[in-house]
């Protein structure tokens, strides 16, 4: 009987389940959305039980659509939105809503801690202190949910990121993997353990934390489909995408084009620090840890959504490609989509969106082109930062916006690097499936996985150097003018 791997891909707005075969082909997908809650400005929450219910429905739909028997599922892998923080009791019941990675409620707390301990935190965790990561969210819960700290001291509270919660609901085991642990701002990425000094700074009892394991091993067994199935793969979404892109060698880099862009480069067994990028754990496998540098760009695909829903100059995201191609060049129009500040490598929370260079002749095609170009410029900003530490030959891409050929060609041109789009676009779920399959010998080795990675299209750079650098200089100038704007208007 043919065997398959089930991958659970738990995102920020939906829970998905995908069944993969031995060649990495998709046999069936289930996907269900769940709501986000905004109790106060800047606060973002999920109901963990709504995530769980959506995930269970997605699993059942994927199995049904794949037309496979539960007994044919050889292992389950999990990948997840990272940093989102959940606390629950030993019966698996949540004790508060999940505090989502986007939530800014702890920004002031983190600013205070950063002033005193910023360098220490970066040295130990690889992260630039921010409300984005789990540590301050856990502290907020312990300080604000009635009796939670008291219960935690009695050993009645469990914390985890979403992967950890799902593994607990599936198997009863309280574990996470290295990649997810490295996003909590509590995990020492050199010692590979929870850091006592950081736990003290954030006033978090160690007893609530999950055991940290490799990204590919059997964590426990589940009977979600009736029969016993090992849960044996776990990685945060961006790390899973790098694994799914077979980015196993030092210097291999992937960019995921979603609401924002996330760019990860494999730095091998070495912990490398960059002033403007995050250092993170890519995965733990066969007793070895692989590290990565990460650049997070907050707004990319969301800028295209704004063209559609905000100023309503397009009906569908795909229209931007045709509009952009109506022009020979950007005609001096730049758009810096700093709607929520700028992420890597600028880290300016006071930057705001800017459109510059418009004239009476500027039309919607200019705005569409400037938006797509901005995504490519922002990606180059991060890759230039990475290249200071590690050589990069090509960019492997995934995510919704990679279907846009204009964007992919412009990306290759502005980077002066080959851009490679794979056949299977679901690289995040595929990465989790590979990790799960390796643990149960469904796949034998990284070499076998590498041989399954297939190219759909390669975009070679075609732009001359003078044009490329002139365009990029214009971009850098536009960014300068967008930076700090929120401070200017509030002073």
Curated annotation (Swiss-Prot):
| Binding residues annotated for ATP, in chain numbering | 12-14, 259, 301, 305, 400
Q: What class of enzyme is it?
A: transferase
Q: Please report the name of this protein according to its UniProt entry.
A: Glycerol kinase
Domain of life from the UniProt record: Archaea
| UniProt-listed Enzyme Commission number(s) | 2.7.1.30
Report the protein's function: Key enzyme in the regulation of glycerol uptake and metabolism. Catalyzes the phosphorylation of glycerol to yield sn-glycerol 3-phosphate.
Q: Which family does it belong to?
A: Belongs to the FGGY kinase family.
Concerning InterPro entries, the annotation shows: ATPase_NBD, Carb_kinase_FGGY, Carb_kinase_FGGY_CS, FGGY_C, FGGY_N, Glycerol_kin
**Residues where sn-glycerol 3-phosphate binds:** 12, 82-83, 132, 237
**PANTHER family, alphabetized:** GLYCEROL KINASE, SUGAR KINASE
Entry keyword set: ATP-binding, Glycerol metabolism, Kinase, Nucleotide-binding, Transferase
Per the record, what are the reactions this protein catalyses?
Answer: glycerol + ATP = sn-glycerol 3-phosphate + ADP + H(+)
GO terms for CC?
A: cytosol
Instruction: Provide one Gene Ontology biological process annotation.
Output: glycerol catabolic process
Q: Where glycerol is bound, by residue?
A: 82-83, 132, 237-238
Q: Which GO terms describe its molecular function?
A: ATP binding; glycerol kinase activity
So, what pathway does this thing act in? Polyol metabolism; glycerol degradation via glycerol kinase pathway; sn-glycerol 3-phosphate from glycerol: step 1/1
Q: Which Pfam families match?
A: FGGY_C (PF02782), FGGY_N (PF00370)
The residues that the entry says bind ADP are 12, 16, 259, 301, 400, 404
């Amino acid at each position: 009987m043919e065997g398959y791997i089930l991958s659970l891909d738990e995102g920020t707005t939906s829970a998905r389940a995908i069944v993969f075969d031995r060649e990495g082909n998709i046999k069936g997908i289930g996907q269900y959305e769940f709501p986000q809650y905004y109790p106060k400005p800047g606060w973002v929450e999920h109901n963990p039980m709504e995530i769980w219910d959506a995930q269970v429905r997605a699993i059942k739909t994927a199995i049904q659509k794949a037309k496979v028997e539960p007994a044919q599922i050889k292992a389950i892998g999990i990948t997840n939105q990272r940093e989102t923080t959940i606390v629950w009791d030993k019966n698996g019941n949540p004790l508060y809503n999940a505090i989502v990675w986007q939530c800014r409620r702890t920004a002031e707390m983190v600013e205070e801690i950063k002033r005193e301990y910023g360098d220490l935190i970066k040295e130990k965790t690889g992260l630039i202190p921010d409300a984005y990561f789990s540590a301050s969210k856990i502290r907020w819960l312990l300080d604000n949910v009635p009796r939670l700290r008291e219960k935690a001291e009695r050993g009645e509270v469990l914390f985890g990121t979403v992967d950890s919660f799902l593994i607990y609901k599936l198997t009863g085991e309280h574990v996470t993997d290295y990649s997810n642990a490295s996003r909590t701002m509590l995990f020492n990425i050199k010692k590979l353990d929870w850091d006592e000094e950081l736990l003290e700074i954030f006033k978090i009892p160690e007893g609530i934390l999950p055991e940290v394991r490799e990204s590919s091993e059997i964590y426990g067994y589940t009977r979600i489909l009736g029969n016993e199935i090992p849960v044996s793969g776990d990685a945060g979404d961006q790390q899973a995408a790098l694994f799914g892109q077979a980015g196993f060698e030092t210097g291999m880099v992937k960019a995921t084009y979603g609401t924002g862009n996330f760019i990860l480069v494999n730095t091998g067994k070495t912990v490398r620090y960059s002033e403007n990028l995050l250092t993170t754990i890519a995965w733990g496998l066969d007793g070895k840890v692989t590290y990565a540098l990460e650049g997070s760009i907050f707004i990319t695909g969301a800028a295209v959504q704004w063209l559609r829903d905000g100023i309503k100059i397009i009906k569908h995201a795909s229209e931007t490609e045709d509009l952009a191609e109506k022009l020979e060049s950007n005609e001096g129009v730049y758009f810096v989509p700093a709607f929520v500040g700028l992420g890597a490598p600028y880290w300016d929370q006071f930057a705001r969106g800017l459109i510059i260079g418009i004239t009476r002749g500027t039309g919607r095609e200019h705005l569409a082109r400037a938006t797509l170009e901005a995504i490519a410029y922002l990606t180059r900003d991060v890759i230039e930062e990475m290249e200071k530490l590690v050589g990069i030959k090509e960019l492997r891409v995934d995510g919704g916006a990679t279907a846009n050929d204009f964007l992919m060609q412009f990306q290759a041109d502005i980077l002066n690097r080959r851009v490679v789009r794979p056949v299977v676009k679901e690289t995040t779920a595929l990465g989790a499936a590979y990790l799960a399959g390796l643990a149960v010998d469904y796949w034998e080795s990284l070499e076998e996985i590498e041989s399954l990675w297939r190219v759909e299209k390669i975009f070679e750079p075609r732009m001359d150097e003078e044009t490329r650098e002139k365009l990029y200089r214009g971009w850098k100038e536009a960014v300068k003018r967008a930076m700090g704007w929120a401070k200017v208007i509030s002073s």
